[in-house]
Amino acid sequence: MTENHYLLLTPGPLTTTKTVKEVMLYDWCTWDVEYNMMVQQVRAKLVSLATKEEERYITVLMQGSGTFSVEAVIGSVIPKNGKMLVCTNGAYGKRIVQMAEMLHIDVVVSQTEEWEPTNIVEVEKILQQDKEITHIAVVHCETTTGIINPIVDVCKLGKQYGKVTLVDAMSSFGGIEIDIAELQIDFLISSANKCIQGVPGFGFVIAKRDELLKCKGQARSLSLDLYDKWETMENQNGKWRFTSPTHVVHAFYQALLELEKEGGVKARYNRYDNNQKLLVNRMREIGFKPLVDEKYQSPIITSFIYPEEWFDFEQLYNELKRDGFVIYPGKISKVDTFRIGNIGDVHEADIHRLVDSIAKGVVIG
């Protein structure tokens, strides 16, 4: 198998290892006992990554993009008379609001600017004033900008006021240490193609068992019924309720083994964090400033402000692609930015090569 044709410096899909790609060269049967045993191992490994209190939590795997898993949670967990508070400061928080509205779920929003973290004071004020709220949702790493939201404080407040807590950890789980029991998270959602460094094809939900059991019969969708998905996997020893992405599951299992070999989530966080800090330092040297304040910046993806009015992102994108790199355009409305991801099979030497390539095509100041 040939090496990558270019390096993805994006927040997922991302650059995977050759060994992760190689396991997808074979075909697998969804009914095969060995395959279903692998599914069960994946589920168990995810819980062990999420908490030391493994007996209290379970994993549900869900076909589709991470958004499918988020919508499965929103549509299955919140009862008809429920009401959700959503903390938003980017596109993915707004998407949760949109899901709730489409599903006719009563929703209230705590919104901050895209470069500012969730406002805990405002969240508490809303919880104090609106006694009808039953659930609270927050995005951990909002990849619209790369900002980290204070999930410790949000979940603590949620439990202080007796709410069910939902955390979209799509772009952080596996790359930032999280103990969902300590943080009092009831439902955590992530995806195969993010920090665990698998490929796109399924998402997953790590849920507190007691809370999941309350969801039976509540789903607003047949194929996105979180409880029924879990019940099928649980009762049929790893069998998915509908056709599973077998190649993607094998790639994900391999990626989990490689995460363990790297030294676990802490070691991976250190690599990502080093990538991010090196990237910012090198980009500052050639005239680019990050959007997000350092104290709120994640190690996942970094937004850089356009340096001058004449700056042409499309030209930079095409030049970088010719040099073997792919980066992301900006996603916020008030400031012109572009984004560079720090995750995947990306290392210090790659960051140096990238910035050297940017410096060739851009002269600032």
Swiss-Prot record:
Catalytic reactions on record: (2-aminoethyl)phosphonate + pyruvate = phosphonoacetaldehyde + L-alanine
Pfam families: Aminotran_5 (PF00266)
Cofactor(s) of this protein: pyridoxal 5'-phosphate
Matches recorded under InterPro entries: Aminotrans_V_dom, NH2EtPonate_pyrv_transaminase, PyrdxlP-dep_Trfase, PyrdxlP-dep_Trfase_major, PyrdxlP-dep_Trfase_small, SP_NH2Trfase/AEP_transaminase
Keyword line: Aminotransferase, Pyridoxal phosphate, Pyruvate, Transferase
Molecular function GO labels: 2-aminoethylphosphonate-pyruvate transaminase activity
SUPFAM superfamilies: PLP-dependent transferases
EC number: 2.6.1.37
Keyword Transferase included in the entry's annotation: yes
Gene Ontology BP terms: organic phosphonate catabolic process
Catalytic EC class: transferase
Modification N6-(pyridoxal phosphate)lysine, positions: K194
Subunit structure: Homodimer.
Family that this chain belongs to: Belongs to the class-V pyridoxal-phosphate-dependent aminotransferase family. PhnW subfamily.
Biological role stated in the UniProt entry: Involved in phosphonate degradation.
PANTHER family: 2-AMINOETHYLPHOSPHONATE--PYRUVATE TRANSAMINASE (PTHR42778:SF1)
Protein name as annotated: 2-aminoethylphosphonate--pyruvate transaminase
